C-alpha cells in the first residue's frame, strides 16, 4: 500500500519570482519607457524652457514610478532564469517646476551609458517616490518617502536634494543603512551612509561671495540671509570672510521664505552707502528681488550662493534673478568635454535639447550610484556603500574640465576640482564670469 501524500499546508514563495521584461537588446541598453516622465501633451500648466539654461520639462508633469533598464545582451546565453533588477530609489523632496524630466532622463542616460560601457551587466530599476517635505511641506512626508524606498528594496537612494531634508533625514539614513546621494551643500551632511554629489557647498559659497565682492574693490555691502537649516552657515562664513577682507556690512537682514519689506531694506542699504549686495540661503526669497530693485530704480552689483541656479526651476524664477551674479556649476562654455558629449547623447536619446545645470548634476549622481553598485561585492545597501567609497577620479559633466567625482572612507563629498563657478544672469543671458581660484596675498 502506497503512502498517502500529505495535504499541506505548503510553504509557498513569500515573494513573486523575477520576470523577464522582454526588452533587452543585443547591442545597446534598453529601457521600458521612452523617458522618465509621462506627460507628452498640453494638458499640464506651463511650457518648456524658453532659454538654454531653463528647465526643459513641463510644470506639473509626473514621473513613472518604475523605470527598468536592461544591459545589452551582446550574444550572451543565460541559464534561463531571469535576474531581478537591482533597485535605485529616487526621492523627489521639493517642487522642481520644469526640472523633473531633466532629473530623470539624465539618470536613465547615465545608467544606459554605464551598461553600454560594460560597467554593470544586470537589470536596474529606478523606483521614484514623490515625497515633498521641508521647507514648504511637512517634514514627515520626506521621511516616509525615504523609508518607503528602503522597504521596496532599494540599495541606494538618489536625493534628497535640499539641505533641510538631507539634514533632517541624516540619522534615519544611517539607521536604515541605505546610502543617500544628496545634492545638498550643507557641510554637516556627511556620515556613514550620507554622500553628496552636491549642488554647491554652503560654507565655500559664503566665502566665495565675500571674496568676489572684495575683488571688485567694494568696502561696504548689504547682507541678506534666509531662515532655514543652512541660513546661519551662509551668514556666518560670509560675515567672517568679509571681516577678514576689510568689508563693512552696512545692514544685515534675516529673511523668511516669503520676505517682507524688501524695498525698505534695500533702500536703507543704499542710503548707508552699500556698494554691493549679498544673499545667502535656500532661494525662495530670491524670486522677489527683481521687483524690489526695479521699484527702487537701483541696479547695484549683487552676488548670491547656489540659490542662483533656481533660474532653471521655472521661467518666472529666472526673471526674478535678473541682474545677479551667483555661484553656478556649469564650466566655461565648451570647455568640459564630458559635458559636451553627454549633451549630444542626451539629445540623440530623448529627442530634445536641455543644457541646464540639473542635467549635468543628475547624470553625475546616477553615474556615482551605478558605479557604486558595480563596485559592490553584492547588491545590498551595506556593500553598495562600500562600493561608493571605491570610486576614484570619475569623470564629471558638471564644472570645469578638471572636475571629477571621488569618495573614500570619511570622505563622502563627491565633487572635487572646479565644481563651483561664477555666472551672471542679465538681459536673459547666462554669462560665464569665471572659475574661482583665489591666491595668497603674499603672491603679490
Please place each PLM-identified region on the residue numbering.
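Extracytosolic ligand-binding ectodomains
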Residues: 1-444
Amino acid at each position: 500500500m502506497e503512502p498517502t501524500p500529505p495535504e499541506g499546508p505548503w510553504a509557498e514563495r513569500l515573494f513573486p519570482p523575477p520576470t523577464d521584461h522582454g526588452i533587452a537588446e543585443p547591442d545597446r541598453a534598453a529601457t521600458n519607457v521612452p523617458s522618465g516622465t509621462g506627460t507628452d501633451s498640453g494638458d499640464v500648466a506651463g511650457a518648456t524652457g524658453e532659454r538654454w539654461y531653463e528647465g526643459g520639462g513641463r510644470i506639473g508633469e509626473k514621473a513613472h514610478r518604475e523605470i527598468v533598464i536592461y544591459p545589452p545582451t551582446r550574444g550572451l546565453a543565460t541559464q534561463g532564469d531571469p535576474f531581478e533588477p537591482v533597485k535605485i530609489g529616487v526621492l523627489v523632496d521639493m517642487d522642481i517646476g520644469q526640472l523633473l524630466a531633466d532629473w530623470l532622463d539624465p539618470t536613465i542616460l547615465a545608467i544606459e551609458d554605464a551598461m553600454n560601457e560594460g560597467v554593470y551587466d544586470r537589470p536596474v530599476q529606478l523606483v521614484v517616490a514623490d515625497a515633498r517635505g521641508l521647507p514648504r511641506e511637512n517634514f514627515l512626508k520626506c521621511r516616509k518617502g525615504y523609508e518607503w524606498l528602503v522597504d521596496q528594496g532599494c540599495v541606494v537612494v538618489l536625493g534628497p536634494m535640499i539641505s533641510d531634508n538631507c539634514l533632517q533625514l541624516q540619522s534615519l539614513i544611517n539607521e536604515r543603512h541605505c546610502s543617500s546621494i544628496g545634492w545638498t551643500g550643507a557641510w554637516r551632511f556627511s556620515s556613514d551612509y550620507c554622500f553628496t554629489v552636491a549642488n554647491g557647498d554652503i560654507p565655500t559659497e559664503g566665502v566665495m561671495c565675500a571674496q568676489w565682492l572684495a575683488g571688485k574693490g567694494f568696502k561696504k555691502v548689504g547682507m541678506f540671509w534666509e531662515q532655514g537649516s543652512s541660513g546661519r552657515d551662509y551668514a556666518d562664513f560670509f560675515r567672517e570672510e568679509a571681516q577678514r577682507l576689510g568689508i563693512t556690512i552696512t545692514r544685515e537682514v534675516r529673511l523668511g521664505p516669503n520676505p517682507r519689506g524688501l524695498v525698505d531694506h534695500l533702500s536703507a542699504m543704499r542710503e548707508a552707502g552699500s556698494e554691493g549686495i549679498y544673499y545667502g540661503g535656500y532661494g525662495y526669497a530670491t524670486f522677489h528681488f527683481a521687483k524690489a530693485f526695479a521699484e527702487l530704480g537701483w541696479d547695484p552689483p549683487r552676488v548670491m550662493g547656489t540659490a542662483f541656479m533656481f533660474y532653471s526651476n521655472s521661467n518666472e524664477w529666472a526673471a526674478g534673478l535678473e541682474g545677479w551674479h551667483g555661484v553656478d556649476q556649469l564650466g566655461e562654455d565648451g570647455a568640459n568635454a564630458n559635458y559636451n558629449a553627454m549633451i549630444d547623447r542626451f539629445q540623440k536619446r530623448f529627442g530634445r535639447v536641455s543644457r541646464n545645470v540639473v542635467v549635468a548634476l543628475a547624470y553625475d549622481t546616477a553615474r556615482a550610484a551605478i558605479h557604486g553598485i558595480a563596485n559592490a561585492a553584492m547588491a545590498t545597501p551595506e556593500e553598495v556603500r562600500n562600493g561608493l567609497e571605491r570610486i576614484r577620479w570619475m569623470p564629471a559633466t558638471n564644472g570645469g574640465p578638471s572636475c571629477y567625482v571621488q569618495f573614500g572612507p570619511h570622505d563622502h563629498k563627491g565633487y572635487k576640482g572646479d565644481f563651483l563657478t561664477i555666472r551672471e544672469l542679465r538681459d536673459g543671458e547666462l554669462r560665464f564670469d569665471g572659475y574661482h581660484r583665489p591666491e595668497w596675498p603674499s603672491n603679490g
